[in-house]
């Protein structure tokens, strides 16, 4: 629900043209078994695919497809990325600075800076319920809250079910083309590190 409000705020021009996005998602797992899904290369483990996908998807939604990127990572004992950072650069010169970690808890927030203000998506930005919009144009700070029940995946399931009932195979909110572009970028980032899973 909050993502709808974010899209409205961005399209309204409240913060002007988006120039920078900072977003992170890091946590320290309670258990760190090498055989578990988080750290096991046989199960496509690592921070990028487990939690880094959320900041990356947010960047895609806000800024589109990047023209270039630079990235670095910390290889863990199982060979997967336990921590990673990525800078995405876009045709208009804007940038997204993204971070993921399975080594420590980060702020888990997103901060969108525009030419006329900014938007802070508060903690747990991958399932956001609160954002603060600060606009130099209106000289006001506005807090938008959209609480929800559950972990947020229920909204994805409901939306997908609605598409199926309508006989649709694509949609305007998250197109197949955008999904494939994000998957391709994830592969390119891992390629830049030299990280390949055993089944690839």
Residue ranges of model-derived segments:
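Solvent-exposed strand-loop boundary residues in beta-sheet-rich modules
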Residues: 92, 137-139
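C-terminal helix-rich "cap/oligomerization" subdomain common to oxidoreductases
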Residues: 91, 162-200
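A short glycine-threonine-serine/GTX helix/turn-capping micro-motif
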Residues: 43-49, 142-151
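Contiguous beta-strand/loop segments that form the cofactor/metal-binding neighborhood of enzyme cores
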Residues: 57-130, 147, 152, 160-166
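Predominantly a Rossmann-like dinucleotide-binding segment in NAD(P)-dependent oxidoreductases
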Residues: 1-69
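Electropositive phosphate-/nucleotide-binding environments in soluble metabolic enzymes
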Residues: 49, 53, 150-154, 173
């Amino acid at each position: 629900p909050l993502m709808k409000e974010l899209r409205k705020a961005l399209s309204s021009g409240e913060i002007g043209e988006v120039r920078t996005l900072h977003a992170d998602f890091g946590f320290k797992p309670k258990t760190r078994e090498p055989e578990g899904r988080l750290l096991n290369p046989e199960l496509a483990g690592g921070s990028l695919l487990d939690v880094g996908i959320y900041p990356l998807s947010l960047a895609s939604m806000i800024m589109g497809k990047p023209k270039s990127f630079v990235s670095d990572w910390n290889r863990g004992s199982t060979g997967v990325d336990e921590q990673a950072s990525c800078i995405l650069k876009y045709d208009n010169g804007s940038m997204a600075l993204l971070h993921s970690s399975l080594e420590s808890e980060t702020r888990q927030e997103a901060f969108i800076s525009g030419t006329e203000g900014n938007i802070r998506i508060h903690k747990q930005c991958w399932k956001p319920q609160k954002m603060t919009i600060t606009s130099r144009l209106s000289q006001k700070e506005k807090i938008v809250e959209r609480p929800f029940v559950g972990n947020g995946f229920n909204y994805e399931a409901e939306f997908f079910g609605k598409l199926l009932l309508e006989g649709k195979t694509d949609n305007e909110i998250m197109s197949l083309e955008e999904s494939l572009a994000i998957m391709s970028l994830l592969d390119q980032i891992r390629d830049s590190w030299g990280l390949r899973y055993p089944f690839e």
